[in-house]
Amino acid sequence: MKTLVLGLGNLLLCDEGVGVHAARALLEEGCPEEVTVLDIGTAILDALEAIEEAERIVVVDAVMAEDGVPGSVYRMPLDAFESPTSIASMHGFDLSRVLKLTTRTTPPEVVVIGVEPETIAWSLDLSPVLAEALPVIIEAIRKEIAA
């Protein structure tokens, strides 16, 4: 099964860039041949071709839960963002709309690994809490890849 890991986020805003940091760390560690990892930042449309080819997509992004604790890692389906809920993407990505732009007849399975941010401020680095949580985030992604 061809799996696509999408690291989303804005690297200029500290923890908002956690998806990008996670994608880069995963690339450094290495992945199975059938896994493609893309650091797409906030340019999800740039991944359209890869999205069309994927059978499974794992999205990694900063999300805010109603009573979330910074550094918490959540696993949720894509449709968790399609209606007002207690969880919100940090930069309002709408992968479900992007999927509709593809020529696919069968949508891929999509899982979101969301990470509760501690700090959203001008910085290229993750906050200490999220930097410490990065191995947990990578492990959550690896579990999805292996599933």
Give the ranges of each region predicted by the language model.
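N-terminal catalytic or cofactor-binding beta/alpha core of small enzyme domains
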Residues: 1-117, 124-135, 140-147
